[in-house]
Amino acid sequence: MGPSCPVFLSFTKLSLWWLLLTPAGGEEAKRPPPRAPGDPLSSPSPTALPQGGSHTETEDRLFKHLFRGYNRWARPVPNTSDVVIVRFGLSIAQLIDVDEKNQMMTTNVWLKQEWSDYKLRWNPTDFGNITSLRVPSEMIWIPDIVLYNNADGEFAVTHMTKAHLFSTGTVHWVPPAIYKSSCSIDVTFFPFDQQNCKMKFGSWTYDKAKIDLEQMEQTVDLKDYWESGEWAIVNATGTYNSKKYDCCAEIYPDVTYAFVIRRLPLFYTINLIIPCLLISCLTVLVFYLPSDCGEKITLCISVLLSLTVFLLLITEIIPSTSLVIPLIGEYLLFTMIFVTLSIVITVFVLNVHHRSPSTHTMPHWVRGALLGCVPRWLLMNRPPPPVELCHPLRLKLSPSYHWLESNVDAEEREVVVEEEDRWACAGHVAPSVGTLCSHGHLHSGASGPKAEALLQEGELLLSPHMQKALEGVHYIADHLRSEDADSSVKEDWKYVAMVIDRIFLWLFIIVCFLGTIGLFLPPFLAGMI
């Protein structure tokens, strides 16, 4: 053998050792097939197992045992005639909103569901004493329970959380959901209203012969409820029902939860009711405002516009329905009619206030009623007229011009006496004189003894030009007396207008008080306040 023999022997030995150490088919034959990234049955490689990885291997083995040949579309019953009993319960986390206009209630709830799946049972002793597993709900059969009275959004649960699986085959699944359920809103006592909203749950495809519901609790679980700032849950109970629909011959079970919720009225009381009451009280002040100020109509119209704005605000809040008018809407409508009536009454009062003798004659019944007895009933005291002075000639003059006419008469008498003295010194008697008796009559042509007799009787002899002057003075006095009488009649009309204002002042106060009582009394008697 040549020198290459040792090299050949060494190469042969290395090849034999390589064949002995390398497994048949190579390392690729021992490598497990790749699994999908989301495959729940996939498990980490043994080299990646942490300390205590034997438990994970046991769970992996249990998963393979449970879901080998499992069909998630078939009902979990041994026989097709068997019924799956689903225990159902509801837990509310938050009452998000109650939309009165669209008549919807938005809630955040947890649907508690529990049933038995005989295909998912195992013996804990065979699998490391594992008594429960959390499995994705997409891998197992779940009942198709939906919200029947859904108003918007998804009917079924959208967030598929994991289910809690027990060794006895019991499946416990509590998925969260946000539902918008339809609710018939009754706004009769708004904002002191109480609503009764329902949530109806049941299987959409399985009738009572396939799936039957059983309540976990008679009431809604409120342990995790987050209080709302607008609504308070008074009561929430569930009832089991079985109903036959027109579409199908089968009977379908359902569990209906009735939520009795009461509105917290503080916000609406501060921002709506109190301002409305204050504006309504301004209507009363319209009749206390004097007619001479000229702002009565302006105040009435301003109040009417303010109430119109409040009515528009309520229209945006309450649902657009013609079935019932809310109590606050009735109150505002009543107040608007009242304010409109006050405008009409104010126009009439202003018309009465500006009447005069040249345009109207006061009837006797108006003078007797509105100037006599009615003011006494309303506790109105009219100041008495000033005391009139008595004229020496018994002429009734106006108080304001009494002094002027008295002085004029006195001066005339002095002039007449002086003139008579002048004629007496000359030895003559005044050719033409007039006399003024105590009753205001003029006498002319008196002379001699007759004139002396007239003077003794208190009458005065006047010259012709003095007689004309005196007649002018009496004309002025009569005109002033006529103006004084007209002014007195005008004051009577103004007082009649004041009495009418006072009548409606008390009438509006009473009606406003009764309207306020009528606003709060019905909800109080109904137990909503």
Swiss-Prot record:
The UniProt record lists the keyword Zinc-finger: no
Molecular function GO terms recorded: acetylcholine receptor activity; acetylcholine-gated monoatomic cation-selective channel activity; heterocyclic compound binding; quaternary ammonium group binding
Phenotype for I279N: In ENFL4; markedly increases receptor sensitivity to acetylcholine
Main location: membrane
This protein's UniProt keywords: Cell membrane, Disease variant, Disulfide bond, Epilepsy, Glycoprotein, Ion channel, Ion transport, Ligand-gated ion channel, Membrane, Receptor, Signal, Synapse, Transmembrane, Transmembrane helix, Transport
Summary of the function given for this chain in its UniProt record: Component of neuronal acetylcholine receptors (nAChRs) that function as pentameric, ligand-gated cation channels with high calcium permeability among other activities. nAChRs are excitatory neurotrasnmitter receptors formed by a collection of nAChR subunits known to mediate synaptic transmission in the nervous system and the neuromuscular junction. Each nAchR subunit confers differential attributes to channel properties, including activation, deactivation and desensitization kinetics, pH sensitivity, cation permeability, and binding to allosteric modulators.
Residues on Cytoplasmic side: 353-502
Membrane topology reported for the UniProt record: Multi-pass membrane protein
Reactions that this protein is recorded to catalyse: Ca(2+)(in) = Ca(2+)(out); K(+)(in) = K(+)(out); Na(+)(in) = Na(+)(out)
Subcellular location(s) per record: Synaptic cell membrane; Cell membrane
Region of interest: Disordered: 27-56
Subunit and interaction comment: Neuronal AChR is composed of two different types of subunits: alpha and non-alpha (beta). CHRNA2/alpha-2 subunit can be combined to CHRNB2/beta-2 or CHRNB4/beta-4 to give rise to functional receptors. Both CHRNA2:CHRNB2 and CHRNA2:CHRNB4 nAChR complexes are heteropentamers with two subtypes: LS (low agonist sensitivity) with a (CHRNA2)3:(CHRNB2/4)2 and HS (high agonist sensitivity) with a (CHRNA2)2:(CHRNB2/4)3 stoichiometries; the subtypes differ in their subunit binding interfaces which are involved in ligand binding.
Record field: transmembrane: 265-289, 297-315, 331-352, 503-521
Name of the protein: Neuronal acetylcholine receptor subunit alpha-2
Glycan-modified residues: N79, N129, N235
A biological process from GO: synaptic transmission, cholinergic
Source organism superkingdom: Eukaryota
InterPro entries membership: Neur_chan_lig-bd, Neur_chan_lig-bd_sf, Neur_channel, Neuro-gated_channel_TM_sf, Neuro_actylchol_rec, Neurotrans-gated_channel_TM, Neurotransmitter_ion_chnl_CS, Nicotinic_acetylcholine_rcpt
Disease: Epilepsy, nocturnal frontal lobe, 4: An autosomal dominant focal epilepsy characterized by nocturnal seizures associated with fear sensation, tongue movements, and nocturnal wandering, closely resembling nightmares and sleep walking.
Extracellular domain ranges by topology: 27-264
Disulfide bond residue pairs: C183-C197, C247-C248
Single GO cellular component term: plasma membrane
Family: Belongs to the ligand-gated ion channel (TC 1.A.9) family. Acetylcholine receptor (TC 1.A.9.1) subfamily. Alpha-2/CHRNA2 sub-subfamily.
Organism in which the protein naturally occurs: Homo sapiens
Signal sequence coordinates: 1-26
